[in-house]
Regions:
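Active-site groove signature of glycoside hydrolases
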Residues: 106-127
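N-terminal small/glycine-rich loop or linker at the start of catalytic domains
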Residues: 1-15, 74-89, 113-118, 223, ...
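Acidic (Asp/Glu)-rich catalytic clusters
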Residues: 29-30, 62-74, 106-110, 136-139, ...
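Hydrophobic faces of well-ordered beta-strands that scaffold small-molecule active sites
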Residues: 3-8, 36-38, 73-77, 114-119, ...
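Short, acidic/polar
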Residues: 16-28, 94-109, 158-162
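Beta/alpha (TIM)-barrel catalytic core signal, keyed to glycine-rich beta->alpha loops juxtaposed to Asp/Glu
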Residues: 126-307
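N-terminal binding-site loop/beta-alpha segment at the start of enzyme catalytic domains
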Residues: 1-72, 219
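Acidic-and-aromatic substrate-binding clefts and catalytic sites of carbohydrate-active enzymes
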Residues: 13-19, 42-55, 83-85, 122-127, ...
Length: 307
């Protein structure tokens, strides 16, 4: 599978109403986009109910109202971090929780199967074999085509893959973690405590595991590459950042592109699938145009070597 821009649907049904979400989905697919990424807990922290499901519901309504759309798109969703009640603890990854969450996600999405099902977070309170077995059942039952681990450390992913092999069930073939062109300082905690960053160890693990792919989220750093009103977090306050931004600006000028587009093109050139959360048509257009950029070997070398 060649890496492509993935539409992040976190804001659908909350910050972006249903009609506007439909427009963004139409635009994305009209421009050739295929993958749509959501989760069963999007977005409980925004919705007055204190529970998620709004994003999946909007996508399901869109599929219902667009005959043939399901055959043109690929859908990924996640479970593990939806609150069990407003303000309550997350559902976790017990076999019971996974089965219940998957069934509800399929109902909301108005589909019989998702193309990739993610364990959204770790749950070390549950035996790994139990979670792995329940996830594997989703594939054997036809509810999911493939499985991924979101916000898991590399060693736990590998242990889970070994457990799946031991049980004779499908294991993880994708990792989803936070990654972008600018790299934060590892000694400064990010405000989003549940996020797990890609580190050199992660990339080394992926390079030695060819059947495991990386999906990157927060690729555009909440707009910080291009918006002065959204400064970079403290974790990005180090000497390497100005050097990388200078290289980014040079290549952007050479290509007549935006910083965001060069970041996405750089990720794609490294076979990393960037998830781009969108709320406006302009953001969809910018992201899909980035997919058409072909950076030269020299440009990629300069970008990677900077900082």
């Amino acid at each position: 599978m060649t890496a492509s821009v993935i539409l992040g649907a976190l804001s659908f049904g909350t910050r972006v109403d249903e009609a506007a979400s439909f427009d963004l989905l139409d635009q994305f697919t009209d421009l050739g986009g295929r993958w749509i990424d959501t989760a069963n807990n999007y977005s409980f922290w925004i919705d007055p109910s204190g529970l998620g499901g709004q994003s999946e519901t909007v996508i399901g309504h869109w599929l219902d109202q667009r005959p043939g759309a399901r055959d043109r798109v690929l859908i990924s969703t996640k479970s593990g971090y939806e609150p069990v009640s407003p303000g309550g603890p997350p559902e976790g990854l017990s076999a019971k929780a996974i089965r219940a969450a998957a069934e509800l996600s399929l109902q909301r999405l108005s589909t019989g199967r998702v193309d990739l099902y993610w364990a959204h977070v770790e749950d070390r309170s549950v035996p790994l074999d139990e979670s792995v077995g329940a996830l594997g059942e989703l594939v054997s039952s036809g509810a999911a085509a493939a499985l991924g681990a979101s916000n898991w450390p590399a060693w736990r992913v590998e242990r889970a893959r070994a457990a799946a092999a031991g049980q004779g069930v499908t294991g993880f073939t994708a990792i989803q973690q936070r990654y972008s062109y600018l790299q934060p300082r590892p000694d400064v905690a990010l405000p989003e405590s549940g996020h797990r960053l890609v580190f050199p160890e992660t990339l080394d693990y992926l390079a030695s595991t060819p059947d495991l792919r990386l999906w990157a989220y927060n690729t555009l750093l909440n707009g910080s590459y291009v918006r002065s009103d959204r400064p970079l977090a403290e974790a990005y306050n180090h000497p390497g950042v100005p050097r990388r931004l200078a290289a980014l600006d040079t290549v952007a000028a050479e290509e007549g592109a935006s910083r965001n587009q060069i970041v996405l093109a750089w990720l794609l050139a490294h076979d990393i699938a960037p998830i781009v959360g969108v709320t406006t048509p302009e953001q969809v257009g910018e992201a899909m145009a980035a997919q058409r950029l072909q950076l030269t070997a020299d440009q990629l070398t300069r970008l990677t070597a900077a900082g």
